[in-house]
Amino acid sequence: MLVLPLPLYEIIRHAPEWKPLEEVARELGSSVDSLMRYVEEGRAKGVLRVERKVIEFYELTEEGRQRAAEGLPEYKLLKSAVCREGRCTAHLSQHPEAQIALANLAKLGVKPRGNVVELDEETYKKIVAMLEEKQKALAAPHSAPPEVLKEFIKRKLVRKIEKTQVYVKAAVPLELVKPAEVKTVITSEDIATGRWRNYTLKPFDLNIEPPEYPAPVPHFFNEFLDYVREVMIGLGFEEVRGPVLEVEFWNFDALFQAQDHPAREVHDTFYVQWSGPLETPPEHLMESVGRVHEEKWRYKWDRKKALNPVLRTQTTATTIRALAERGDGEYKVFTIGRVFRPEKLDPKHSMEFHQLDGIVVGPGLTFKHLLGQLEEIAKALGMTKVKFRPAYFPFTSPSVEVYAQHPKLGWVEFGGAGIFRPEVTEPLGVKKSRVLAWGWGLDRIAMILLGIDDIRELFTKDLEKLKEYYARWARYKASVGAVGTLFTL
């Protein structure tokens, strides 16, 4: 005999034949959402048959409800007519919606004469009878004739609604199953007393989709990322994208980062066991990059190591791909994406965060151009207090760290920048141009601009906090961008 959770057993008991799940939920005093996971479990176990049907129905819009209660404009106009000696006359000046009424009466062949609508009494009664039927149809749109329903939809008096109805039916006789107390969690006391032996332990099925609950507001951090994208495109940059699962070549080697560099150890990089397909870098780039490593760093470059899969630690892996593909010239590209590092989670650090990476390529570019470009982007995002400090990065020279001021955390580093070294650009075929490059942590920038002092709050599930942070985001966006006002904390 199969042991089932009590809710699933009750569904089977109440649905010996096909029955809407809504009806079963009413009988059980429950809701469809709370029963859905048991329905999916029953389907997966083969004890419940499930069908989904899309049902169409029609409902009145707000204007439709008003017209159903007060009358259609054309109906009200003709009902106000006065009939004498076989002629019926309605005065347009008495009706504020006369133009709407006339537009719909014109489809019935009725035209005004001056400021009145005049019809012979027989025609008048015939048209009024038609409009009365239409008025009745508006009160019950589900039974309206197709051509009338089509008109109501066009006039935005009625809208079509599609709803997925779930039907269930028991797939096994009731006597072959029995209910039992099902546990998803057991305590140390359950184990010590042996009570766990009397429980049915429910396995977790990650393929079952949970019910969806609409968010009260858009997620502020997603809105922020989209806004950064708009800012960069507005400054003349083109967006490029790359994979999250990278080979070490693009993440490190192409950036002139030696294969024994500490950042390439397991405490700074997530290495991935992966047997699926991975894009191999072009052979000529592998050879030229390996040769530069051996000449400059003076070690034997390991081709096999360069092809190890890693979770990218920097979105520079994507911009360096774009540089290798496009070569010399004049262009500006950027990318926004997630990067991963084995960090300890605290208010300032996370093992998964977002970066804005960009490059500007062209002849004659200097360090002044770089600082000017960085300041332009920072101001476009509303950061009024920015400073630069000299820094070292393996793949840029000269290099700087970029800081912005947070009201509680003080000066917060959110990115690095520099000019790509010849050891980076020349193996990729870039020999006539200089390349300005930077990578910024967007999570920290969002914290600075929105006054958030803990990076974990960017992913909070607290609905009240989401509303609060969205309100801050709305105030921030209203203060920058097209308006031109800089946001100062």
From Swiss-Prot:
CC cofactor note: Binds 2 magnesium ions per tetramer.
Catalytically driven reaction(s): tRNA(Phe) + L-phenylalanine + ATP = L-phenylalanyl-tRNA(Phe) + AMP + diphosphate + H(+)
PROSITE patterns, A to Z: AA_TRNA_LIGASE_II
Disulfide bonds: none
A molecular-function term among this protein's GO annotations: ATP binding
CDD domains: PheRS_alpha_core (cd00496)
Key words of the record: Aminoacyl-tRNA synthetase, ATP-binding, Cytoplasm, Ligase, Magnesium, Metal-binding, Nucleotide-binding, Protein biosynthesis
Residues bound to L-phenylalanine: T316, Q355, L356, D357, F395, F420
Keyword hit for Aminoacyl-tRNA synthetase: yes
GO terms for cellular component: cytoplasm
A Pfam family of this chain: tRNA-synt_2d
EC number, as in UniProt: 6.1.1.20
Localization per Swiss-Prot or TrEMBL: Cytoplasm
Coarse class of the protein's main subcellular location: cytoplasm
Cofactor: Mg(2+)
Keyword ATP-binding on entry: yes
Database matches in SUPFAM superfamilies: Class II aaRS and biotin synthetases (SSF55681)
Any GO BP annotation: phenylalanyl-tRNA aminoacylation
Family of the protein in this entry: Belongs to the class-II aminoacyl-tRNA synthetase family. Phe-tRNA synthetase alpha subunit type 2 subfamily.
UniProt cross-references to PANTHER family, sorted A to Z: PHENYLALANINE--TRNA LIGASE ALPHA SUBUNIT, PHENYLALANYL-TRNA SYNTHETASE
Subunit structure: Tetramer of two alpha and two beta subunits.
Name this polypeptide is given: Phenylalanine--tRNA ligase alpha subunit
